[in-house]
Every structure is written in structure tokens, then in C-alpha cells.
Curated annotation (Swiss-Prot):
It comes from Carcinus aestuarii (Green crab). Optimum temperature is 50 degrees Celsius. No activity at temperatures below 25 degrees Celsius or above 60 degrees Celsius. Its EC number is 3.1.1.4. Optimum pH is 8.0. Stable between pH 6.0 and 9.0. One of its GO terms (biological process) is lipid catabolic process. This is Phospholipase A2. Its cofactor is Ca(2+). The keyword Metal-binding applies. Signal peptide: none annotated. Binds 1 Ca(2+) ion per subunit. One of its GO terms (molecular function) is phospholipase A2 activity. Belongs to the phospholipase A2 family.
Length: 12
């Protein structure tokens, strides 16, 4: 998915 935040752990 698409990374969000500092380390791309959140996914949209």
C-alpha cells in the first residue's frame, strides 16, 4: 500500500 508517516507503516 501506500506508505504514510515516517516509516510507511500506515496504509491507506
Amino acid at each position: 500500500x501506500i506508505g504514510a508517516g515516517a516509516t510507511s507503516k500506515l496504509v491507506y
